């Protein structure tokens, strides 16, 4: 009995030494595992941090920004950019805008230190359930790191690096600075980077004008800009907006009344007008070309100017403010004048025929289907292609898109068969529309407003509306126009052709043509400094010149083909007499004329023969117009100026271009020439 009891007691009460050894082993194991874990974490930290990028791109935040080009009156001429981003400070935004983004993306932003462990754990559990990385749990600080320093690759390695960098970044920058970077860097769809560009693209306003409802919609975009784009997926965008507003209400960042007002606000989507490549398109393009050349690294080094970007990168990414001499009113009238002149020129040459002829019913239906009509074209007397459906002597019925109209024969009076041997005015006007067009023809036509000065209501237009149109013809001949302010050299208007959309070749700058009689004032100006006066007599008689080297004979004539005998120098210039001009050039010498041309800024090269007096040198319209500034400004030639100043995105001056003038003529010479050239307009070939 005693032995059994003793045995049971030993079995139920363990040896104290065994318990002690167990506790020792347990503590050693736990400590070892903890040390191994710490060593593992330390190894991971060392591995993850060995090739981490620096913070320079963030602490010295210089994102790609839109360069803005201004006209003379500070209106916007256009933009240059690769990413449509306008820098906006936090104090320029309404308070509810950043709060909306925080509600949607990171409501604990101002409480955590760059990493939100609860969000990470939540994302980890969802990813484990999904078997793949579906959710990131990134804070706004981590998103800034990802967008500016790391790739968008979804891996745990990248997430570890992202977390480490986010923790470090919050020691370098304040919360407000990080949030400002995020709100300017984020892509929000529709080609808009940052909240200012998004406000312009979606609502046609600046960021400071956004309502709570509008801010909530923008805040819902970062998660999936395409999916939640309100222009393409309005229902998804609305659902996401409601989520953001509900989160703002839950967090106490808006009141119930503000919430109710926001969810009931009807959003109006409209894009802020972009004037780029509209009026002044050739001017804008020439400014772009000159900026790239001026801001090249070599040129900046010569001028001692240090920039972060050079050449095209500076133009498209630096957010420059570029000020130009272009006067919008002058530019508008210059473009219209050139277009009207080219259209008038093509009409004088007669009717070339339809753009195309469509014989089959299927082809005609396809044309109407594939060529919708812009209401703005109707409103502004624009041009469209129309399909002729029926023709009578009195006119033609036409279709365009889903609309119909009529071209009366009175609009076709100029549509004569081209005949270069007959003066246009002597050709009978067209009186039968059937001689011009037939059913199936596709022609250009211009809208004619019913009553001059009466506003056009596009909303009242229906498929049953009958439009009046005039037949038109697209010009084949091109032209250019340059207008320079002679006192400053400011190029107030520059047009390089009929349509920038059809051809970006800038004939005002890039094309060199013989100026012809426009060169004659240079000859006569030289003559005034070589013994001639306006009252001097010059013989207008046949002239024959034989080149000794080639034995070729040159027999120039006046435009009229007639000879006028002794002629006053004044009359010779006013009437643009070729033979008088050649005799003057022969008398004063070609070298003197070339020297005067160079003094006026013409670039040449110049042929050293008598033909130069009739304008055989090739010059650009811009170059020739600059030369003429000396006649209009007391002999001072003003160097042409298109760009007046350049500033950085932070309004720091980079370059200022002051007017540059050079004395090319004496004031007396310039006065006499200006007087004679006025007579050209009043009573000569310019009349």
Which residues make up each language-model segment?
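N-terminal type II signal-anchor transmembrane helix
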Residues: 5, 9-70, 108, 128, ...
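Non-catalytic, structured segments within soluble enzyme domains
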Residues: 42, 132-401, 584, 595-599, ...
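Short active-site loop at a secondary-structure junction
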Residues: 86-91, 423-434, 474-479, 502-522, ...
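Active-site SXXK
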Residues: 101-102, 248, 334, 488-489, ...
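Short, well-structured active-site flanking segments
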Residues: 110-120, 193-196, 255-259, 458-464, ...
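Conserved catalytic neighborhood of penicillin-recognizing serine enzymes
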Residues: 129-154, 208, 272-283, 487, ...
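A penicillin-recognizing enzyme superfamily signal
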Residues: 324, 328-340, 344, 363-369, ...
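Mid-domain, small-residue-enriched loop/turn segments at the edges of structured enzyme/sensor domains
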Residues: 551-556, 589-626, 639-642
């Amino acid at each position: 009995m005693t032995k059994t009891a003793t045995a049971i007691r030993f079995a139920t009460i363990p040896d104290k030494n065994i318990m002690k050894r167990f506790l020792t082993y347990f503590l050693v194991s736990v400590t070892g595992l903890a040390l191994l874990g710490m060593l593992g974490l330390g190894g991971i930290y060392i591995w993850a941090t060995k090739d981490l990028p620096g913070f320079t791109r963030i602490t010295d935040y210089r994102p790609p920004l839109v360069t803005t080009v201004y006209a003379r009156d500070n209106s916007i001429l256009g933009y240059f950019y690769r990413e449509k981003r306008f820098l906006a400070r936090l104090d320029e935004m309404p308070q509810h805008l950043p709060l909306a983004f925080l509600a949607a993306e990171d409501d604990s932003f101002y409480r955590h230190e760059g990493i939100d462990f609860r969000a990470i754990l939540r994302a980890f559990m969802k990813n484990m359930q999904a078997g793949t990385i579906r959710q990131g749990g990134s804070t706004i600080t981590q998103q800034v790191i990802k967008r500016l320093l790391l790739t968008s690759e979804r891996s745990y390695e990248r997430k570890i690096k992202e977390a480490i960098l986010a923790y470090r970044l919050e020691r370098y920058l304040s919360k407000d600075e990080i949030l400002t970077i995020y709100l300017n860097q984020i892509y929000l769809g529709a080609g808009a980077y940052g909240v200012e560009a998004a406000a312009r693209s979606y609502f046609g306003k600046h960021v400071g004008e956004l309502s709570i409802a509008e801010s909530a919609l923008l805040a819902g975009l970062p998660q999936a800009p395409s999916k939640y784009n309100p222009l393409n997926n309005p229902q998804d965008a609305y659902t996401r907006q409601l989520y953001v507003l509900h989160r703002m209400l839950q967090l106490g960042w808006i009141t119930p009344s503000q919430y109710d007002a926001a969810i009931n606000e009807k959003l109006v989507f409209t894009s802020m007008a972009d004037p780029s490549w509209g009026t002044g398109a050739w001017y804008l393009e020439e400014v772009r070309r000159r900026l790239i050349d001026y801001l090249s690294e070599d040129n900046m080094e010569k001028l001692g100017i240090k920039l972060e970007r050079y050449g095209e990168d500076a133009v498209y990414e630096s957010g420059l403010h570029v000020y130009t001499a272009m006067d919008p009113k002058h530019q508008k009238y210059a473009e219209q004048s050139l277009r009207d002149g080219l259209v008038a020129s093509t009409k004088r040459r007669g009717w070339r025929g339809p753009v195309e002829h469509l014989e089959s019913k299927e082809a005609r239906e396809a044309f109407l289907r594939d060529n919708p009509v812009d209401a703005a074209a109707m409103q502004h007397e624009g041009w469209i292609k129309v399909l002729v459906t029926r023709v009578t002597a009195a006119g033609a019925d036409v279709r365009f898109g889903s609309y119909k109209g009529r071209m009366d024969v009175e609009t076709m009076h100029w549509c004569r068969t081209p005949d270069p041997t007959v003066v246009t005015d002597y050709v009978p006007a067209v009186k039968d529309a059937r001689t011009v067009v037939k059913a199936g023809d596709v022609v250009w036509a211009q809208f004619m407003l019913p009553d001059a000065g009466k506003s056009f209501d596009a909303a009242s237009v229906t498929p049953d509306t009958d439009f009046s149109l005039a037949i038109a013809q697209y010009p084949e001949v091109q032209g250019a126009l340059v207008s320079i302010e002679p006192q400053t050299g400011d190029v107030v208007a520059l047009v390089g052709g009929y349509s920038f959309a059809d051809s970006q070749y800038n004939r005002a700058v890039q094309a060199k043509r013989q100026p012809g009689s426009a060169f004659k004032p240079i000859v006569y100006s030289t003559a005034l400094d070589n013994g001639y006066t306006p009252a001097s007599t010059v013989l207008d008689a046949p002239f024959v010149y034989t080149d000794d080297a080639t034995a070729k004979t040159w027999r120039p004539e006046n435009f009229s083909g007639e000879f006028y005998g002794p002629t006053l120098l004044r009359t010779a210039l006013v009437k643009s007499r070729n033979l008088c001009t050649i005799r003057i050039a022969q008398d004063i010498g070609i070298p003197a004329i070339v020297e005067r041309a160079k003094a006026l800024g013409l670039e040449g090269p110049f042929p050293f023969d008598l033909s130069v007096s009739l304008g055989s040198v090739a010059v650009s319209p811009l170059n020739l117009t600059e030369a003429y500034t000396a006649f209009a400004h007391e002999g001072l030639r003003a160097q042409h100026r298109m760009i007046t100043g350049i500033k950085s995105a932070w309004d720091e001056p980079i370059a200022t271009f002051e007017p540059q003038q050079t004395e090319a003529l004496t004031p007396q010479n310039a006065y006499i020439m200006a007087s004679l050239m006025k007579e050209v307009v009043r009573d000569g070939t310019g009349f």
